[in-house]
């Protein structure tokens, strides 16, 4: 199988900027693009294949068709037909809004199959920019 290329899903946000469009050399007019979802199996926001014989199919359709040969046997057994990662570019032109993602246990209580797993790549930023991450917050 040849490598798959996916159409990006551009997300405008209140904190987004214009670096993603320039970085990806896109010829579009969209403002405040804070995220470009490169690979997503999130229902309702699934990546669409842009090339080859799978062109036009969603990522989860590809997984459902190719099963273990696409994800590997262990991953397919664990995640089924839903691709388990969300991979995206972030352009935070301002401070981000608070992001809260449930773990698997909390997601199950909310009727969802699993928590949200992401991978981010932050585009080049201003010299004085500082990343902030709060993990394992608990109510007092």
Give each language-model segment a name.
Residues 1-134:
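Transition-metal
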Residues 135-140:
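Conserved small/polar residues in nucleotide/adenosyl-binding loops
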